[in-house]
Regions:
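Short amphipathic alpha-helical face segments that pack within enzyme cores
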Residues: 45, 49, 98-101, 236, ...
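Glycine-rich Rossmann-fold phosphate-binding loop(s) that bind the pyrophosphate
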Residues: 38-41
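Dinucleotide-binding Rossmann-like beta1-alpha1 core, especially the glycine-rich loop
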Residues: 81-164
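A short, Lys/Arg-enriched amphipathic alpha-helix followed by its capping loop at the start of a domain
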Residues: 46-59, 244-250
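Extreme N-terminal leader/targeting segments of oxidoreductases
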Residues: 1-34, 52-59
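Active-site/ligand-binding neighborhood in enzyme catalytic cores
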Residues: 156-252
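A generic secondary-structure signal for well-formed alpha-helical elements
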Residues: 54, 68, 74, 96-111, ...
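Glycine-rich FAD pyrophosphate-binding loop
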Residues: 51-78
Length: 252
């Protein structure tokens, strides 16, 4: 498979031989500048990659941000009369290849002897995420039996759903596509509570989530498929990128 790259000889391959090679400095990079809107994780990561892989001088990178705190929704700060506020945490998984590729080369602010990825990995290795009981009802009684209770017909309905062309799901809600029986299964309860879906949400978004996170299905009943940073994601993820960008340190 050909890649969209300045070098036509590069192709997608198996193994790590090509992935571990440091990128060459592109011709003419000294004459280029980058202007990034916002300081969410996407913009911060782009800045880090421009320095690490494109060898762009940090002085040529400009961020436009209206807020006092970088990180977009990955914020976290002490607010007067409110206490410490962070807008939620993001559920992480093994297959965030681009993110982990970046964090494998950024020093952790929580342990200077580790990279961000090292610290994240060992946090979850030593204290893996696991829920003995995902759902309760009737004032604390266990609700689920750690099974999806789908049956063959409903499992087939899900399989057929992910094969529907995107165009046919435009402007359709989940409850317009899924049967009432499927919406009353434990699978749907487990899925919707993990990914914050409502029945009236976009069917197309549901399909995209299933395509992206289907490998997490086995861990739905126990949340064992998920990993979390030790602290809020501003502290664990945003600060290391901001510090690197400010200090313009060499990655290698």
């Amino acid at each position: 498979m050909k890649l969209k790259t300045h070098d036509d000889r590069l192709t997608l391959t198996n193994g790590s031989y090509h992935a571990l090679v440091h990128a060459r400095k592109p011709k003419g990079i000294e004459n280029k500048s980058a202007y990034l809107i916002g300081t969410g994780i996407g913009a911060l990561a782009a800045g880090c990659f421009l320095i690490r892989d494109a060898h762009m001088d940090g002085s040529k990178i400009t961020f436009f941000e209206q807020l006092d705190l970088p990180g977009g929704s990955l914020d976290g700060e002490v607010l007067q009369n409110l206490g410490y506020v962070a807008r939620g945490g993001r559920e992480m998984g093994h297959h965030f290849e681009v993110l982990w590729g970046l964090f494998s080369s950024l020093p952790s602010t929580e342990d200077p002897n580790m990279t961000v990825l090292d610290h994240f990995f060992y946090t979850n290795y030593d204290d893996p995420n696991y829920s003995n009981c995902r759902i309760t009802h009737k004032n604390g009684e266990r609700y689920d039996n750690a099974k999806f209770n789908l049956g063959q017909d409903l499992a087939k309905e899900l399989a057929e759903f992910v094969l529907i062309p995107d165009e046919e799901l435009q402007d359709k809600s989940i409850d317009e596509i899924f049967s009432e029986e499927l919406l009353n299964t434990d699978f749907w309860t487990l899925w919707r509570t993990m990914f914050a879906f409502e029945n009236w949400h976009s069917a197309l978004e549901m399909k995209l989530y299933m395509n992206r996170f289907i490998h997490h299905v086995g861990g739905l009943p126990t949340l064992s498929a998920l990993q979390f940073s030790r602290h809020d994601q501003y502290t664990s993820f945003v600060k290391p990128m901001v510090i690197f960008l400010k200090e313009l340190k060499d990655f290698y």
